[in-house]
Amino acid sequence: MAAVGLQKTLGFEILPEVKPGEVEARFTVTEAVAQPYGYCSGGTMLALEETMAGAGSRRIAGEDAMPLGINVSANHVKAVPVGGLVTARATALRTGYRLHVWNVDLFDEAGDLVSTARVTNVIKRRKTAEEH
């Protein structure tokens, strides 16, 4: 799926699926997503974490699925400066019909953990043209 919306605006690259129940991504911290001190903003990291969980839920639940984030809880544990590369891995912890829970970890170029999040998505189904 092509990058759209927030994913495109912030420059997140969701990588092709390697393993079911896992999503990998990367992005370079730019001044556009930095806080005033020259480091990646926490809001940008939260956006990546929720975006990854949504992408993973969509892969699992199918094209008619609309994963909607209903809870995100994160701890940012290390700063990443402008120009730094962030890599990320999301792992599905539970993938029921209506509820998915993901763990998402972000890493800097040295492989150090910079943020960890738990994301819960509710899975809604898109209505078909006949259902409208």
Please provide the spans of the model-predicted regions:
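Terminal targeting signals and extreme-terminal segments of soluble enzymes
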Residues: 1-132
